[in-house]
Amino acid sequence: MKTLRFKSMQLLSEREKKARAVQFHPNRNLILGLNHVGKSTLTKQIFETLGAAPMGKLEGWDNTTITLLTAIIDDQEFYFMKQFSNRAIFNSEVQVVASTGRLAEWAKVFGAFMNFNLVLSEQKREDRASGYGMYVSAFLHQSRWGLEWHLAHL
């Protein structure tokens, strides 16, 4: 599997008529702030842009926000864009590497792009996990430890 490092995130909410840009440190990041300043929104938008749909609803969250995530993958820069259900990967020359409007297709495309190759064994059958498996940590919600986890998309 390739190494993925976030560089920056840009968000545009047409509904709220607001935009935001966040730069990430190349080695470590701590998302810190008071309640209702956007920590969960930023985290959720990162995973949504990459194709995950973490559990839970955020109050007042604009799910039509357009996002552009810049990431370094194995020392090469790529751009990941999400607008509604459409997602795309662009290389550093802003050429389309892959795009789709279907989430199930995106999981396969992104999993292949990242060389994600998790094999799940069940009884006598083996299946390759979709790209959703890369996001297991996004599905583990800290305030829901006692409740059942829903990892159906793996």
PLM region descriptions:
Residues 83-154:
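Extended, charged alpha-helical "arm/stalk" segments used for dimerization and assembly
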Residues 1-78:
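Extreme N-terminal "head/tail" segments of very large remodeling/mechanoenzyme assemblies
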